[in-house]
Structure formats: structure tokens, C-alpha cells
Amino acid sequence: MKEKTIIIVGGGQAAAMAAASLRQQGFTGELHLFSDERHLPYERPPLSKSMLLEDSPQLQQVLPANWWQENNVHLHSGVTIKTLGRDTRELVLTNGESWHWDQLFIATGAAARPLPLLDALGERCFTLRHAGDAARLREVLQPERSVVIVGAGTIGLELAASATQRRCKVTVIELAATVMGRNAPLPVQRYLLQRHQQAGVRILLNNAIEHVVDGEKVELTLQSGETLQADVVIYGIGISANEQLAREANLDTANGIVIDEVCRTCDPAIFAGGDVAITRLDNGALHRCESWENANNQAQIAAAAMLGLPLPLLPPPWFWSDQYSDNLQFIGDMRGDDWLCRGNPETQKAIWFNLQNGVLIGAVTLNQGREIRPIRKWIQSGKTFDAKLLIDENIALKSL
């Protein structure tokens, strides 16, 4: 019997890890990866950090260059897909080539959510999703230049830190009343706000751009009435899923390809993962997780489901952010208001814990990354703690 053919569409973390997971889990059939980028699949997190700060930055490949040939994965880089061929099981490229598939994994990622007022600036306005974006930003982030960043989420703050370290004059504009409001607990939000302000970043909360004039400098008029002059304008206000191919194939979409708990779409032969995917929960709500680890996890889950294998046991959600000399790691549930703090954030070393009825459900470490491993185990096991002991620095965490 002829083995099935699996095609992966995409060139990022989820796509590469889907290929790796399929081979690791025993798939020996024909495996193809199609990407519109000419690079081998590369890591996205460094784009806002090391790619802007290092003297001679290099793209960090998700898998070694020789892995693809050694594992008999056919790479098709720099190509554009015309149709997925859901009915015919024939993927068609714009150059006329067609490729048969039995199962499909879509990991086309996402673009920056548009901001028309700034997009009208053309090349004077920047977003950050790809290696080319980072290269363009690196050229313009020069000392003493005035940089305005719209959006104080993870990407916005990482860019603010990198631009400041490149000796730019940075202002961040945020519509909400806080920074990193979507994915950090309140005490961490407060710490980050103060950290950036101490570094010289001006952060304008509860504000937005109302009018833009393009001249020698970009003139930005805010809702507050203030006018800013900028050499460089960057924005990061969320994502717009690259779902067009899926939508044209009549898959369920909602600013993302709708998947179930095993990454399967409404077509049992088509799976999706990474930033392009949005999961329908048991209660019917849609949930998207934009992180490096989620891309890896969904690739593993989809590979197992495609091969009819038991699903891997996944750790609690985890992501990290590097800002200035700080490394922050977020694990577990970030919701809730009653966070405990171990250590002193003013010394740039602390851990915030989220206890629910004594059970540890989430944590954030500040320059304490070595503690993530035991914390992960505690969250997975539902370990209970005495709050006083947990925050007592005289008691080693490993002894609890």
C-alpha cells in the first residue's frame, strides 16, 4: 500500500516543528513544506531583540540546514500557493505546478493587524513580523532619532527596549491604561512600566493617534491634543491571521483557522497550528495563543493526531520576554489579582506567584529563569503551598 503524502504550508516555527514531529513520531511517507519566504524556517523571537542589537546578527534556523535533506523533507521555498485544493487534494502554485496531498497542515502565521492611519506613511512606517522587517528597522534605528511606537504589548515593549539600547529617543503610545495588559499580571505590568520609564522611555497610556502629517519628520497628533515629531514610526497592535487560503477553501475561519483540541479543522484531513490557528474551546469560545511554545506544542499535537497516535502530555503555557537586561518568563495562568511576590523587583530579581485556594496555577520570574523547571512541575501536579513559606527568601524554593 502506498504511504500517504503530507504537505505543510508555512515557513515558521509551527511549520518546521510539524515536519520534525512527524518524522520523530514515525511518519516515513512523502513530506513537503511550502513557504513563500526564501529563508529556511527561522526563529521569530530574536527579531525584536538580537537581530536589532547584535553587531553581526544571523537568522537562527529552527532546524539545522542539513536536517531537511537527512530526513527526506522536500523544501519548496519562495513559492506562492494559489489554492489548497480541498476538493481535489491537489495543492496548486501560482506557477501552475500542482502537488497531491492526503493530509495538510497549515501554519501560514499572521501579519501585523493594519493601522490605516499609519500605513498611509508607506515605507516610513514599520511593523515587525519577518526577517526583512527587522533588517529595515535596524537601518533606521540610529542614535538620537525620535522613535514613536504604537502599542505597549510584548512586541512594542521589546522594540522600545531595543531602540533605547540603540540610543534612540523613544515614546510609546498605548490605548489601554497599562502595558502588556493582555498577558501580564498587574504587578508585572507596574514593574515593566517603571523599568521603561527609568530607561528614559516616555509611555503615554490611555492615548491614541488621531491625525498624521508626513513631512521631514512625521507629525503625530494624539487624542490628548499633544503633537509628537518622529523620525521613525512603528506599530504593533495585534495580528491579522493569514487565513486567505483557508477561507477560499471554505474552512471555518474567524481571524484564524478554527481548530479543535487536536488542531483539526472542519475538514478531517486538514490541520492547522501556530499564529494562524484559533481553538474552539468546549464552551464554544475561541482562543488564540501567540507564542513560540504554542507553535511547538500544536505542531506535536497535530502530528500525533494526523498519525493516529496518542497525544503528547503538554506542559502549562509558557513564554518569555527579554527587555534591557531583564529576562521575564511567564508560566501558567496569568489571570487573577492576588499575586504574591518573592524577592524585590527593584533589585531586578523576583518571582510573582498566582495561588488559587493554595494551589499554584501561575508564576512570572524576573531574572530567575532557573526556577522555571520546578515551578512548571508544581503547576502540572497541582501542588499546594503555604503562601508565607513560598515568599520567604530564607527558604530555598527547591526545599518546598
Swiss-Prot record:
UniProt-listed Pfam families: Pyr_redox_2, Reductase_C
GO biological process, one term: 3-phenylpropionate catabolic process
Catalytic activity: 2 reduced [2Fe-2S]-[ferredoxin] + NAD(+) + H(+) = 2 oxidized [2Fe-2S]-[ferredoxin] + NADH
Keywords on record: Aromatic hydrocarbons catabolism, FAD, Flavoprotein, NAD, Oxidoreductase
An example Gene Ontology CC term for this record: cytoplasm
Family, per entry: Belongs to the bacterial ring-hydroxylating dioxygenase ferredoxin reductase family.
Subunit comment: This dioxygenase system consists of four proteins: the two subunits of the hydroxylase component (HcaE and HcaF), a ferredoxin (HcaC) and a ferredoxin reductase (HcaD).
Record protein name field: 3-phenylpropionate/cinnamic acid dioxygenase ferredoxin--NAD(+) reductase component
